[in-house]
Amino acid sequence: MNDVAARYPWPATGRYVRAMMVMGLDGATVGPDGGSRSLSGPADLAALLAIRSHSDAVVIGAETLRVERYKPFRAKPELQESRAAQGLDIAPRLVIVSASLKLPWEEPVFTESALAPLVATVAGHDAARLDRAREHAEVLVAPGSRVDPAWLLDELYARRLHRIVCEGGRGLLGAFADAGVIDEWDVTVSGMAGATRFDLAESRDQDGFLFTRFTRRHDG
């Protein structure tokens, strides 16, 4: 386990749900590029990959899939010994929550991932749409008009997927929070507000609050 992964340990056994996100100083979860990449950086990406590398499943919303253009979840040779020792499959499984089932099925994330993605949707779709989805993913149909996080987690646990990372978007993270199913929040605060960069001047933890000061960067 590398130094970054050691900062984000998983319990040795049992079920555990992490919520992971990056946000700007103004509360934005998307940057000037319309996605999270312009808020992120090498250190944040290293944390994201370290958490994923020891997870069973990564849960995202359909819009996050479309905007962020997720790459295939492949089996990485350098991680196989570590994953096997922890009882994990060859790669994390991607789980997509989509009420509409209107997904980019031609994307490599569906055609080239080591394990077929799971897609959680709602009842009421016609047979043709469900059949198309099932050509590319394992489809879970929730009862009712929404995908309840507790129901989804039970479905994942039944498939022996116990280490869960929810990467958003914002609405899905909110649904998980409202359902009270999150065990840990891993939040990166970017020094961006809009297109303006700020630098951390001070931080302190007191009485359960994290107090920070960021000052505007003046280049040159």
Language model: regions and residue ranges:
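Enzymes that bind and transform nitrogen-containing heteroaromatic metabolites
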Residues: 1-220
